[in-house]
Design a protein with these regions (language model features):
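SAM-dependent methyltransferase catalytic region
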Residues: 1-82, 87-91, 100, 104-116
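C-terminal substrate-recognition regions of SAM-dependent nucleic acid methyltransferases
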Residues: 5, 87-192
Length: 192
């Protein structure tokens, strides 16, 4: 409540990011701030919250959003539906947002699977109903072919994704391959 007002529904298109000083460089590396607006909206305890934001949070390929925030979004199971656009121009013609955009419906009283609709392009839409972190990857698998591969791998070995001794993640770096932050690295014993 604010001044004795109650909020049943909050709708927003929050600012996406803070410029990190590089106006001509890699804008997808700017510090994301949209999660702060989502958190503030949740504190108002609305019944429903819907916002449109860049999709990079779903794959953890974003600067500025804490892992805990992403974990909470994936595991609280309060998002009843996500409409995800791989190409932001399919949602906002003429606007390029790296990684695409999504809008979601967060429901305070909901605790079930999410209806995930992926707009691959104007003619191809993929839909599934599942918990956002059902494969325990700690990201939303956007690619419909990849999700089927991961499900098959999980059937063969349920611990494969989380056990770095069994999977590929122990020998490669997940991001920032060629930036000044880190070079391409590997712990593979035969890496030269």
């Amino acid at each position: 409540e604010i001044f004795n007002m109650k909020f049943d529904v909050i709708v927003g298109n929050p600012p996406y990011q803070l410029n990190v000083g590089n106006t001509t460089g890699n804008s997808c590396k700017a510090k994301s701030i949209n999660h702060m607006f989502i958190e503030q909206a949740k504190k108002l305890n609305p019944r429903y919250l819907t916002m449109i934001v860049p999709s990079r949070w779903m794959t953890r390929s974003v600067e500025g959003i804490p892992d805990k925030w992403i974990d909470d979004m994936l595991n609280e199971n309060k998002i009843s539906v996500i409409y995800d656009f791989l190409n932001s121009q399919d949602c906002f013609p003429g606007v390029q947002i790296e990684g695409g955009v999504n809008y979601f419906l967060w429901d305070r009283d909901y605790k079930k699977e999410c209806r995930y609709i992926l707009n691959i392009n104007k003619d191809t839409i993929y839909e599934r109903v599942d918990f956002l972190n059902s494969n325990k990857t700690d990201i939303i698998i956007r690619d419909p072919f990849a999700i089927n591969i991961i499900k098959k791998v999980n059937i063969l070995n349920p611990n494969y994704i989380k056990n770095s001794e069994q999977n590929f993640s122990s020998i490669v770096s997940p991001k920032d391959f060629f930036t000044n932050k880190t070079l391409l690295t590997s712990s593979w014993k035969d890496y030269k």
